[in-house]
Amino acid sequence: MGVSMALEVLVYLAVLVWTCAWDIDVDVSCSQDWMTVSVSAFSQNKRNPYIFADELYLGQNCRVTQIHAHQYDFIYPVSHCGIRTKVISNEIVCFETEMYFRPRNYCLELQIVPLQCSASRKSVWLMPLSTEEDPKPVKSPFMTDFEATPEELGLLNAHQAASSQNKR
């Protein structure tokens, strides 16, 4: 009888822990300057399937920045929220932080979701698109030194004024 009672308690604890487990969908993306974390507002927990924005925090108490119908976004510079930076190589930098999830009413145990993202240190905006050896475009002989005279500008304005009066 003692063994079956102990087995029942273990099964009960396993079920209790399993029902408190949350399966949260998280998508992390980053650049050299920004980290974006998108969290689905729906979980796989059958008893409490909806996650509220005030239950989520990024790093050092940073709140959700955008609320959509089906997801929440954290968009922060990598220098905020305690986001840690690791230089992997001359070309790659890695950012690490945590997302904290504290459910409102159910299983009041705090859950910590580790997050990691890597980005290239070589910005496409800083790379040259052409070099000195690239051919230069030939200057067009058309309209290169065109300057409208005041008379020509007056004629253009008179034509526009006349056409706008015809539309009335």
Swiss-Prot record:
Cytoplasm keyword on record: yes
Keyword Cytoplasm: yes
Gene disruption phenotype: Deficient mice are viable, with no overt abnormalities. Female mice are fertile. Triple-gene deletion of OOSP1-3 in mice retains fertility but causes significantly lower blastocyst and reduced offspring number.
Coiled coil: none
Keyword terms: Cytoplasm, Secreted, Signal
GO CC term, one of those recorded: cytoplasm
Location of the protein in the cell: Secreted; Cytoplasm
Signal peptide bounds: 1-21
Domain of life per record: Eukaryota
Tissue: Expressed in ovaries. Highly expressed in the germinal vesicles oocytes and metaphase II oocytes.
Family named by the database record: Belongs to the PLAC1 family.
Name this protein carries in UniProt: Oocyte-secreted protein 2
